[in-house]
Amino acid sequence: MIYGTGVDIVDISRFQRFVSENNTSLLQRVFTPRELEYCSGKKHSAQHFALRFAAKEAFLKALGTGLRGGVSWQHMEIVNDRLGKPEMLLTGKAGELFAEAGLQKIFLSLSHDGNMAVAMLVLEK
């Protein structure tokens, strides 16, 4: 049974600015060390940061909580499986809320075109 859906679209140039200005404090607040390493190692790092940010926003929309009650950007992490498929890992309060709601699965799709990055996420009970 579907519990919630979330969609978010992000302008990649916003993250290009953060990367160009070397705004590490913002990037470190939003992304986990593993995400920072992954994105920073890519030729188009801003695109990868934007996709991960959109996924986190989509998750918060699907869950219906936003960033409150102790949920942190660091509690949501986007990783890729061995075939490149994106997956969301949850820790901390985000993981607790996911479990408390009786949720079982996260379906995540990421895409980009031109200067836009989009994430679509479905939470299943």
UniProtKB/Swiss-Prot annotation:
Binding-site positions, Mg(2+): 8, 57
Gene3D superfamilies membership: 4'-phosphopantetheinyl transferase domain (3.90.470.20)
Any single GO BP term: fatty acid biosynthetic process
GO molecular function, one term: magnesium ion binding
Transmembrane residue ranges: none
Main location: cytoplasm
Substrates-to-products reaction catalysed: apo-[ACP] + CoA = holo-[ACP] + adenosine 3',5'-bisphosphate + H(+)
Keyword flag Lipid biosynthesis: yes
Keywords per UniProt: Cytoplasm, Fatty acid biosynthesis, Fatty acid metabolism, Lipid biosynthesis, Lipid metabolism, Magnesium, Metal-binding, Transferase
A Pfam family it matches: ACPS
Signal peptide feature range: none
Needed co-factor(s): Mg(2+)
Record localization: Cytoplasm
EC number: 2.7.8.7
GO cellular component: cytoplasm
Top class in the EC scheme: transferase
Entry superkingdom: Bacteria
Residue stretches in coiled coil: none
Protein role: Transfers the 4'-phosphopantetheine moiety from coenzyme A to a Ser of acyl-carrier-protein.
Protein family per UniProt: Belongs to the P-Pant transferase superfamily. AcpS family.
Record's protein name: Holo-[acyl-carrier-protein] synthase
Organism: Geotalea daltonii (strain DSM 22248 / JCM 15807 / FRC-32) (Geobacter daltonii)
